[in-house]
From Swiss-Prot:
Known partners and oligomeric status: Fourteen ClpP subunits assemble into 2 heptameric rings which stack back to back to give a disk-like structure with a central cavity, resembling the structure of eukaryotic proteasomes.
Protein name from the UniProt record: ATP-dependent Clp protease proteolytic subunit
Active site (UniProt): 102 (nucleophile), 127
Example of a GO MF term: ATPase binding
E.C. designation(s): 3.4.21.92
UniProt keyword annotations, A-Z: Cytoplasm, Hydrolase, Protease, Serine protease
Family, per entry: Belongs to the peptidase S14 family.
Organism, as annotated: Borreliella afzelii (strain PKo) (Borrelia afzelii)
One GO cellular component, as annotated: endopeptidase Clp complex
Catalytic activity: Hydrolysis of proteins to small peptides in the presence of ATP and magnesium. alpha-casein is the usual test substrate. In the absence of ATP, only oligopeptides shorter than five residues are hydrolyzed (such as succinyl-Leu-Tyr-|-NHMec, and Leu-Tyr-Leu-|-Tyr-Trp, in which cleavage of the -Tyr-|-Leu- and -Tyr-|-Trp bonds also occurs)
Function in brief: Cleaves peptides in various proteins in a process that requires ATP hydrolysis. Has a chymotrypsin-like activity. Plays a major role in the degradation of misfolded proteins.
Subcellular location: Cytoplasm
Alphabetized HAMAP family for the sequence: ClpP
GO BP term (any one): protein quality control for misfolded or incompletely synthesized proteins
Length: 197
């Protein structure tokens, strides 16, 4: 049964006398939807960036929808996605489904202002960057300084994106800071909670 987890669902589209089969992610991409699920790493970031650039080339005036269900991951991979979101012309709407933790929360907050959303029972978590450090004392010092630099960068960007004072944000990020969708709305991480009308 393990092989079942590796299957990607397909969608059959009927057009006239023809049928076309799409994997579900390609079909969503036609609707300008990108789905970022799981750990954020370099290969996943490359895929998301390619999709963002492709959708911009298709229509630079229509919003792109980035659905997030992620426990977080690599800071550098997340920053690459963030930079691309800010670089392209279309607004990127971010929608949390399930969870947006750590770098996932950072990307959720990076959506276009007024277009950052969450489903009702999603959870959002922010915290400071962390990393395992080993090696010689000089290497440990270099790595520690880099983690502190990245922490300051993340706080600066998030503070600007969500309008929370840097000192408060730094204090809240000292430990895992979990929020419901309602908490995230009050905090400024999202702009709307999506409910069925």
């Amino acid at each position: 049964m393990e092989f079942m987890h590796n299957l990607i669902p397909t969608v059959i589209e009927h057009t006239g006398n023809y049928e076309r089969v799409f994997d579900i992610y390609s079909r969503l991409l036609r609707e300008r939807i990108i789905f970022l699920s799981g750990e954020i790493n370099d290969p996943k970031a490359d895929t998301v960036i390619a999709q963002l650039l492709f959708l911009e080339s298709e229509d630079s005036n229509k919003d792109i929808y980035l659905y997030l269900n992620s426990p977080g991951g690599s800071i550098t991979a997340g920053l690459a996605i963030y930079d691309t979101m800010q670089y392209i012309k279309p607004d990127v709407r971010t929608i949390c489904i399930g969870q947006a933790a750590s770098m996932g929360a950072f990307l959720l907050a990076a959506g276009a202002k007024g277009k950052r959303e969450s489903l009702t029972y999603s959870r959002i978590m922010i915290h400071q960057p962390w990393g395992g450090i080993s090696g010689q004392a000089s290497d440990i010092n270099i790595q520690a300084n880099e983690i502190l630099r990245l922490k300051k960068l993340i706080i600066d960007i998030m503070s600007n994106q969500i309008g929370v004072d840097k000192e408060k944000l730094a204090l809240d990020m000292e430990r895992d800071y979990f929020m419901t969708s309602s908490d995230a709305l009050k905090y400024g991480l999202i702009d709307n909670i999506l409910v069925r009308e």
